[in-house]
Amino acid sequence: MAKTPYLTTPPKITTMPPGVPYIVGNEAAERFSYYGMNSILTIFMTKYLLDRMGHLSTMPPANAEAWYHTFVSTLYFLPIFGAVLADAVFGKFWVVFWISIVYCAGHAMLALIGTPIAHTIEPRYLLAIGLILIAIGAGGIKPCVSTNVGDQFGESNKHLLTRVFNWFYFSINAGSFISTLLIPWLLEPYQADPNGFIARLGPSVVGFLQSPRLHSADIAFGLPGVFMAIATLVFWLGRKKFVHIPPVGLKTYAREIFNKQTGKIILNVLMPVPFVMIFWALWQQNFSSWIIQAESMDRHLFGIEWLSSQIQTVNPIFILIMLPVFSYWLYPFLEKFVRLTPLRKIGAGLFVTAASFFIVAMIQTRIDAGARPSIIWQVWAFVVLTAGETLVSPTHLEFSYTQGPVKLKSLIMCTYLLAISLGNQFTAAVNFFIQNPDGSVKLQGASYFMFFVWVMLGTAVLFTIVSPFYKGRTYLQDQTRVTGDAEPGVGFAVQPEA
């Protein structure tokens, strides 16, 4: 057997694996690129999309939401192929590296929309091609990146796994926080407040910051591409620090999948998916319908008029607050009265998420009546939505990882991503269905949000009935199986993503 210059099993150490900083750095830059692009996609399609002649050719909100959620659904469906390539053919490292290059190409296609090339190629074609490439890139690496974190750990340092998953989650939210503030600002025209801080920086600085060239689609879509290139470089630099779990080969892989035991494991892990998918059908709308709603609200807060696509920045802020609060205070307190299994956390999160959409529906009722409510009400809805996310997303992710046999980690992780894909496809289907030929929609205003409230409540009730019947096992990278209770003692992990 040929020797490899890379580690193929976790080293027997009790400290942090040496490859972790590269993985976390890669994830922070990649999440900056994705969430930056993601934050402006809906608003770009509804406000700034042009045709080849340079005329405004925007999409109606329902159509833009359908496009957006179809893109996200495709992105989260493709990881199944990345998982097979990673586990059976090439290994996780090479799949992440090469598909990251496709990812960069997708960002480049979106950046071309703001260049003279858009006068020769229809911008909607560039948009579609770019989104397809990004879906392939982001989707292909998703089952590999978070499992690559787990692959770095063995029995001797497994106690650090949850801590690293928390840092991993922190890097996601740090990247998304910065990008969702900056990238929308680069897309929208900017005029400095004559009495503000920027106006006192000098004419040359103010002129640069107000330049139409700076605030353009090619810059707004191009900067995320630069960060994706940085993420790819950081990942390459860490290649000799990582544990490279060898691919098992297609024959072994097929044998592992197509047997009775693995079939039962996959079916068990799929149990939460139909319920969690509805959570994602609601959560992902903070990038679509919530942004469109914010356009009709008074966005003055703390002396600043925020852009509608910047309001979602509060989500990573609340996540960074709620993660330690839930993990170190709320959960230990509640454990004194009731056993908090992962599935119970998920069930509670489903009910909480329904409450967030009820708040948004009440906001929309005021807008429909002609009022212009303060954006602080949507911020409160984000507080509730983020609480639901904290309960559902990281718990389900780590749950999925620990339930996967050693040779099938990436494939089992796809069940988590499948829930996101199906949830977005559900929302896309709703938005396609409600469009009438005359341009009107069947679910208008508050009725649209209330529809999702009732769907989420029904899902949550059904989940509380079904979840007690779940039986499963916990697996780690250097163990064949850990026999335990029906549910593993998992804590916080990481959202890929949304």
Stretches with model-predicted labels:
Residues 39, 77-84, 111-112, 174-189, ...:
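A gly/Pro-rich, aromatic-decorated transmembrane alpha-helix motif that marks the paired
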Residues 96-125, 348-370:
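C-terminal ends and interior cores of transmembrane alpha-helices
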Residues 45-46, 85-89, 117, 182-191, ...:
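Interfacial helix-cap and linker-helix signal at transmembrane-aqueous boundaries
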Residues 66-87, 174-179, 313-328, 422-425:
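Central cavity-lining transmembrane alpha-helices of secondary-active solute carriers
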Residues 1-25, 155-162, 166, 171, ...:
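Intracellular loop-helix junctions on the cytosolic face of multi-pass helical membrane proteins
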Residues 79-102, 108:
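Conserved MFS/SLC helix-loop-helix module at the cytosolic interface between two early adjacent transmembrane helices
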Residues 14-73, 271, 280-293:
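Helix-loop boundary and gating motifs at the non-cytosolic
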Residues 316, 328-478:
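C-terminal transmembrane bundle
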